[in-house]
C-alpha cells in the first residue's frame, strides 16, 4: 500500500513516516501544497495523510483539488485545527477521516490500517 504524507513539519513527518514504514507501508512525503499536487498528479496513492496548515496553500484547497479528479484515494486529515467546525468542514470536503494534533502514533497507525483495509475490501468486491 502506498501512502503520501503532506506535512510541512519535517520532524513530525519523519516520525509518522518511520512508524508507518514499520507497519509495512510504502511512504512518500512532501512538504508543500505545490509538491503534493505534483506528486498526486504523477503517482497513485492508496491513502493521503494531509495537514491543513501548510505554507502558501491551505490543506483544504489541496483536498478540494484532489477530489476534482480522484474520489477513490482515501484522505486522512491530520491537523492542529481540532474544533468541531474544522472537522465537519474537512469531512464534508471529502476527507475520509480526521485526527487532531497532538495525537498518538498507535492511533494513527490503527486508523491508517482501517482505511486501507476498507479500500482493499472495496476493490475485491
Could you say what each language-model-derived stretch is?
Residues 1-122:
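N-terminal/domain-start alpha-helical segments
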Amino acid at each position: 500500500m502506498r501512502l503520501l504524507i503532506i506535512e510541512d513539519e519535517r520532524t513530525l513527518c519523519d516520525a509518522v513516516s518511520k512508524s508507518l514504514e514499520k507497519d509495512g507501508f510504502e511512504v512518500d512525503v512532501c512538504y508543500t501544497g505545490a509538491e503534493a499536487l505534483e506528486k498526486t498528479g504523477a503517482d497513485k496513492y492508496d491513502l493521503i495523510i494531509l495537514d491543513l496548515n501548510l505554507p502558501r496553500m491551505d490543506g483544504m484547497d489541496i483536498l478540494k483539488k484532489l477530489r476534482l479528479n480522484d474520489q477513490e484515494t482515501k484522505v486522512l486529515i491530520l491537523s492542529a485545527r481540532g474544533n468541531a467546525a474544522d472537522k465537519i468542514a474537512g469531512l464534508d470536503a471529502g476527507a475520509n477521516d480526521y485526527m487532531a494534533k497532538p495525537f498518538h502514533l498507535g492511533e494513527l497507525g490503527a486508523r491508517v490500517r482501517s482505511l486501507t483495509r476498507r479500500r482493499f475490501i472495496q476493490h475485491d468486491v
